[in-house]
Amino acid sequence: MLEQEVYKFITKYNLIENGDRIVLGVSGGPDSICMLDILNKIAEKKLIDFEIIVCHINHGLRENAIFDENFVKEFCKKIGVQCFVKHVDIKKIAEEQKRGLEETGRIIRYEFFDEILQKTNSNKIAIAHNINDKVETIIMNIFRGSGTAGLIGIEAQNGKFIRPLIEIKRVDIEKYLKEQNIVARHDESNDENIYTRNKIRNIVLPFIEKEFNPNIVDTIDRLSYIVKEQEEYLESQTEKCYNDVCEQELNLTPDYRLNNKNNATIVIDLKKFNSLEKVIQKRVILYSIKKIFGTTRGIEKIHIDDIIKLCNNNIGNKYLTPNKNLKVENKKKKLRISAIIKYKNSQL
């Protein structure tokens, strides 16, 4: 039974522990409703002593969005779970911030999750990604030419974020809902092959399953675990090397938003840094950037290569700005990796 499978996965990786209060991101679609129903049953049976709270965002992009919202609210009312709803004009925000709709929606969602986390004194956020989402992400990362870390895909836990369904197939989620007589909402935009992920989901993977490997989802999932083991070892070596070459961490906090405002800076001893193997040098740079911003999104191979050249004085400039948030400077035999302060109405 799927409920038992999810429970075993949760306990195997300690995703949920006694005393947890968890915010669930629920759209009303099959994955999130399945997650909500199963976690609610686990909580009701006291298999683990934890609480769940639901949050739902109405993006205002689809005519059916109000029906999704009402469905989530009614479902939560039926099972006695608190539900927070937020209305946002994603299209307007995307235009103002000059971002794509998909990226803007993701940012707004995660900001709302964090807002409810703090408001309710919760400590974890549950996202309903499944194994198909994970494999689709890995394929997208391959198409982008990502490093080996991109072959890991979506992890079961990343800080406060947990994904209880990450090893469950989409077909099994649909089967579970049918058995429970639950008719979840359907987002018709998932059927439109205009987004890369939809093309992979609806065209690429079915073609591979039919023509090459009917078990491609399991095969890629197995690959991700092999890569994860290797990455964990390399990351531990990177952390050791970072601690050896890092001289100072200035204005660095666990709150990445503050780091961006406070000109957080990591100072690295160039002599020690240049003695490292190049593969570790690149990882130390990425590790430093992630320490400041919480992500390496937007940092590409060419940026890292240019920073390595800067460290070896093989580039004309003494500093680089790989993007609008990041500055890297070679100064007085030190490498300074800094968040760029954004001034409002500044004359600088």
Predicted regions located by residue number:
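Non-catalytic, surface-exposed connector residues within folded enzymatic/regulatory domains
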Residues: 51, 66, 95, 194, ...
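Residue-level marker of regulatory loop/turn positions in helix-turn-helix DNA-binding domains and
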Residues: 105, 193, 197, 277
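AMP-forming adenylation/ATP pyrophosphatase catalytic core
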Residues: 2-31, 49-53, 108, 156-158, ...
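ATP-dependent adenylation/nucleotidyltransferase module used to activate substrates
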Residues: 1-141, 171, 179
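Short, solvent-exposed polar/charged micro-motifs at secondary-structure junctions
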Residues: 93-97, 196-197, 229
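Catalytic subdomain that performs nucleotidyl-dependent activation
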Residues: 124-128, 133-227, 243, 250-254, ...
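Hydrophobic alpha-helical segments, especially transmembrane helices
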Residues: 69, 107-110, 145, 198, ...
